[in-house]
C-alpha cells in the first residue's frame, strides 16, 4: 500500500479544492450523529491510530457528532495467549467462557478503550470511555448460536450476548456536552453477568437508536469482495442474501454485514464498509465525493 501524500507538498490551489469539496458534506452532516465501528489495523498501527484520532476530532470541530464503538480482537487474542488460552470462534463469534470474559473486560474496557481516549485527548479532542454497563447503556441477553448442522439446535458459546435494549441517555448527555463517546461492546444481563457482544452488532444497533445519519464500519479489506477478489461497491439486501447463501460472505464478515444491513433497513440513511488500512479513510468516506468501500442498501 502506498504512503499517503505529504500535505505540505500539495499545491495551495489543490488544498483549496479539497476543502471546498468537503463543504456540502459538512452541511449535510452538521449536527448529525455518525457512528463509527473502529477496528482492525487502524487500531494497531501507530500512523493509522493517530490519523483516526485526528479525523474524529475534525468531524467534531465542524459540527458532526462522532460516536465510536471499538473492537479489539487481536489485543484479546494476545492477552489470552499470555495466559495460555487459545481463542475459538464459531460463525465469526468468539467462544467466551468465564475466564475469557474476564480478559475481554480488562482488555476492551481498560487497555484498548483508554488507548483510544488518550490519543484523541492528546490531539486536542475531548473523549470519554464507556462500556455498555455504564449508565445502563447496553442491556444484553445470552446469545444462542443456531447449529447449522442440526436445524432447531443451538450452540452455547458462553458469555456471548446480543443486544436486548440500548438506553442512549448517557451517550446523548456526553454529546450535548461536546464529548466524543468511545464505547466498549460489553453489555450486562438480568442474570448479573457481563456479556461480550460483537462490536459490529453494537455499532449497528446504536446507530439505529441514536437516529444516526451514517454508520461507518472499518475493516482490513477494501470492502465486501466477490469470490474473485473484486470490490463490490454497492450492495442491495437481495444481493447480500445471495452472497450469504453462496458462502461469499463468511466468518467475521457475517456479523458485520448482517449488522450493516439491519441498520440500513431500520432507517440509518447511509451505511458503508470501508478499508481502515488507508490513512484518513473516515474523512475520505464522510467528507469527499470519492467512492470508497461498499455501500449497503436496504432495497
Swiss-Prot record:
Transition state stabilizer (site feature) positions: 37, 256
Query: Which GO terms are recorded in the biological process aspect for this UniProt protein?
Result: arginine biosynthetic process via ornithine; L-arginine biosynthetic process
Q: GO cellular component terms?
A: cytoplasm
By its UniProt entry, which InterPro entries does this protein fall under?
AceGlu_kinase-like_sf, AcgluKinase_fam, ArgB, Asp/Glu/Uridylate_kinase, NAGK-C
Q: What is its EC number?
A: 2.7.2.8
Which enzyme type, at the first EC level? Answer: transferase
Q: What is its main location?
A: cytoplasm
Keyword Iron-sulfur among record annotations: no
Reaction equations catalysed: N-acetyl-L-glutamate + ATP = N-acetyl-L-glutamyl 5-phosphate + ADP
Specify which residues bind substrate according to the UniProt entry for this protein.
72-73, 94, 196
Q: Under what name is this protein listed?
A: Acetylglutamate kinase
Give the organism's phylogenetic lineage: Bacteria, Pseudomonadati, Pseudomonadota, Betaproteobacteria, Burkholderiales
